[in-house]
Amino acid sequence: MNHGDRSFSNFYVDLRNYLRIHKNIVFASKLYVGSFMGKNPQSYLVGGMDNWLFNKFHQPPTNRPEISPVRNPSGIENSNILFAEFMDLRGFDYDEIRGRNVITFSNELRIPLFAYLTRGNITSNFIRNFQLVGFYDIGSAWNDAAPWERINDQNTEVINTEGSPFVITLNNFNNPWLQSYGAGLRTVLMNYYVKFDVARPIRNYEAEELKFYVTLGFNF
């Protein structure tokens, strides 16, 4: 875009590696680092999965509303939602954390069960594409202070009440990194590549309840 005060640019690095473990068993990795710049930088929204059926968006506490391009209760002009980047991170809802900068790292061990065990040709799409997957994801997003800094955007909260001369800065000691691990199935069903994942999210060093995903399309 190039419209004065609404202009922005986006720089990112997307690195992927596929390591063959044995025959067609593969260990896949993806590192994504991105940054929005300019007079009107957009946001990376971290959490969820691409093409997630029955999806959910993160709902912050009512006493701590968070500015986000996907929440617009006042009905003001919100064209920025068109340029927000959704970043996959299993175990969490869409827009769990957000920022102008992002880093995510995903690992998958992919085992095509029937193709691995069978020497002959497999004619069934369902059986030929059937995969077992184990995964681990980690990521964070920020505006100013990066997650590897002692004081960062995720563990520091600034409260500025309208009409008050005081500004309160709180350190909530939150871990700026969201993590998850789990397992999943992949196959082709009715000509669609379908994924089913079960993820255990880790927030602030504590494991939370399992989260289930049904998604369409390849991951990476």
PLM feature spans:
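C-terminal outer-membrane beta-barrel translocator/porin domains of Gram-negative envelope proteins
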Residues: 1-120, 126, 142, 156
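Solvent-exposed loop/turn segments connecting transmembrane beta-strands
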Residues: 1-7, 97-101, 175, 201-212
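Transmembrane beta-strands of outer-membrane beta-barrel proteins
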Residues: 27-31, 105, 130-134, 183, ...
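Short amphipathic alpha-helical segments
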Residues: 102, 176-184, 191, 211
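Short Gly/Pro-enriched loop/turn and capping motifs at secondary-structure junctions
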Residues: 114, 138-143, 190-192, 201-203
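Outer-membrane beta-barrel transmembrane domain signature
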Residues: 131-181
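Subset of outer-membrane beta-barrel
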Residues: 179, 183-188, 196-199, 203
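Outer-membrane beta-barrel "beta-signal"
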Residues: 187-189, 209-220
